[in-house]
């Protein structure tokens, strides 16, 4: 082979080898190859385009205020710890969900007798002065400075200060308060100033699971923002006759009381009022007054300084399964009238004990609280059509609504003592009864502790005045009413009882052998 050919051959082999080497760089296997491949295919996640709450908070926070309350304390002596709490605080049971929340407002001990004695100050009079008794939250609802807060924040005060988001402190006066819904309205004393304000939204459109943003003054830290969701609707926590709270899981703590809960449109859907907490801090269970309730109350407070509600004057109780069965009702809805108040609107219209109010102006009544809310929302002087269930049929009764009295005293107790005679036993119910001395009903003298009657709260001294709306005067009358109910296919009988001037209904199941 000639030298020229050998040279060309070598060049060709070299070129092939180089090409193979270069190709091998792209097909390397093993750890190095895996590393290169991983780097080439690194995962990249595009973050979701969520606006968050910053824009909302920026707009609404200037309208949220802190509320400071002071009380004019008259000259006193230092006689150990003294406490100042909202009216009725001492009557709240220890387990009440509001008691721990209220304790933050004014429940601070003033003075210490032992330390004062050591300093030689015991029993020395102190001049009158203003002392802080509460702090909470609120929000401005008008350009001229009307502020909504809770009644329990302001109820024990004489002087009020509103602190704006920028730290400005302004005096305010109390326009009106409504203890029944725990709402109050203040007016900032700054006639030349225009305030940023927020509007009430429609809480009826709020669904469980919707976002909610709370802004307030927890522990004195004004302008604090938390978020969560609506956990439940229509909560009754025993705080008042019109409980209809929205439950939220946004962090709400001491000092948030009276602050707003916003929807994502920046409208107020609730007023934060209470928390449930074994520890005193937020555990994700807070309660807000619905905006629909607040708007009605606030409008009246601004216009009149008080709230006027409709009232029909009835003592009512829930319709239980047994009561529904005893009356032939298909559903456990409505409110059974235990006793109409003498000369009250309901009594004048013909409402009787034992009637079940099932609707108001065509709207179904779910339970006693629903009835109370519906009637309260009707202006005094107007007429309302009440649908009542009486003697196995529905009928409509028109009632003229009256204004609710401010305070109704408790009825005096009435003794049901009976010295008398041989009682008759209703074996099927474990009751022993004797005729009442006044001829109105029969008095229970003994109750079998293992009976259905005992389980349903019937006690010695109770007076049975009717069975299935039939007046009874003897044990025989009771047995006749029970027999009639059994023949008609009823599964229970309805007893009307009186005790301490209070009337109530109890349903007892019919023992069918």
UniProtKB/Swiss-Prot annotation:
Protease among the record's keywords?
yes
Q: Which reaction does this enzyme catalyse, per its entry?
A: Acts on substrates that are at least partially unfolded. The cleavage site P1 residue is normally between a pair of hydrophobic residues, such as Val-|-Val
Q: Could you tell me where this protein is found in the cell?
A: Periplasm
Q: Where is this region: Disordered?
A: 100-135, 403-428
Which InterPro entries does the entry mention? PDZ, PDZ_sf, Pept_S1C_Do, Peptidase_S1_PA, Peptidase_S1C
GO cellular component terms, alphabetically, are:
outer membrane-bounded periplasmic space
Q: Residue span of the signal peptide, if any?
A: 1-25
Q: What is its EC number?
A: 3.4.21.107
Query: Which biological process terms from the Gene Ontology are attached to this UniProt entry?
Result: proteolysis
- Enzyme class, UniProt record, top EC level: hydrolase
User: What SMART domains does UniProt report for this protein, alphabetically?
Assistant: PDZ
User: What family does this chain come from, according to its entry?
Assistant: Belongs to the peptidase S1C family.
Name of the protein this chain belongs to: Probable periplasmic serine endoprotease DegP-like
């Amino acid at each position: 082979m000639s030298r020229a050919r050998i040279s060309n051959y070598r060049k060709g082999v070299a070129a092939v080898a180089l090409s193979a080497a270069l190709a091998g760089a792209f097909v390397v296997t093993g750890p190095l190859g895996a590393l290169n491949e991983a780097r080439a295919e690194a995962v990249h996640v595009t973050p979701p385009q969520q606006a968050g709450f910053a824009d909302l908070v920026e707009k609404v926070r200037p309208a949220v205020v802190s509320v400071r309350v002071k009380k004019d304390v008259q000259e006193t002596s230092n006689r150990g710890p003294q406490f100042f709490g909202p009216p009725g605080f001492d009557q709240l049971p220890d387990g009440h969900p509001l008691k721990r929340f209220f304790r933050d407002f004014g429940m601070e001990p003033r003075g210490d007798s032992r330390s004062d004695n050591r300093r030689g100050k015991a029993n020395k009079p102190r001049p009158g002065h203003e002392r802080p008794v509460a702090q909470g939250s609120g929000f401005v609802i008008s350009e001229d400075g009307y502020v909504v807060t809770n009644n329990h924040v302001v109820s024990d005060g004489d002087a009020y200060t509103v602190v704006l988001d920028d730290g400005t402190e302004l005096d305010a006066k109390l326009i009106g308060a409504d203890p029944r819904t725990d709402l109050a309205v203040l007016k900032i004393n700054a006639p030349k100033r225009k305030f940023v304000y927020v509007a009430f939204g429609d809480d009826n459109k709020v669904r469980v699971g919707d976002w909610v943003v709370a802004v307030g003054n927890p522990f004195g830290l004004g302008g604090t923002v938390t978020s969560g969701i609506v956990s439940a609707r229509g909560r009754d926590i025993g705080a008042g006759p019109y409980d209809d709270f929205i439950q939220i899981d946004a962090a709400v703590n001491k000092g948030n009381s009276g602050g707003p809960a916003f929807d994502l449109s920046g409208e107020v859907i609730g007023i934060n009022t209470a928390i449930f907490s074994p520890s005193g801090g937020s555990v994700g269970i807070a309660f807000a007054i619905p905006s629909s309730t607040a708007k009605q109350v606030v409008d009246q407070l601004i216009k009149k300084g008080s709230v006027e509600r409709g009232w029909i004057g009835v003592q009512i109780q829930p319709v239980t399964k047994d009561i529904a069965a005893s009356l032939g009702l298909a559903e456990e809805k409505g409110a059974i009238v235990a006793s109409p108040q003498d000369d009250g609107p309901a009594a004048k219209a013909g409402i009787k004990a034992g009637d079940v109010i099932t609707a108001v102006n065509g709207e179904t009544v779910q339970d006693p609280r629903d009835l109370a809310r519906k009637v309260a929302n009707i202006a005094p002087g107007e007429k309302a059509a009440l649908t009542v269930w009486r003697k196995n049929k529905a009928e409509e009764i028109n009632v003229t609504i009256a204004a609710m009295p401010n305070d109704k005293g408790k009825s005096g107790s009435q003794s049901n003592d009976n010295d008398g005679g041989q009682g008759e036993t209703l074996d099927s119910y474990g009751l022993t009864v004797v005729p009442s001395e006044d001829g109105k009903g029969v008095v229970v003298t003994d109750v079998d502790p293992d009976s259905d009657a005992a389980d349903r709260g019937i006690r010695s001294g109770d007076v049975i005045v009717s069975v299935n709306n039939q007046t009874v005067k003897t044990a025989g009358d009771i047995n006749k009413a029970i027999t009639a109910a059994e023949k008609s296919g009823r599964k229970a009988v309805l007893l009307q009882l009186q005790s301490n001037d209070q009337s109530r209904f109890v349903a007892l199941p019919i023992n069918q052998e």
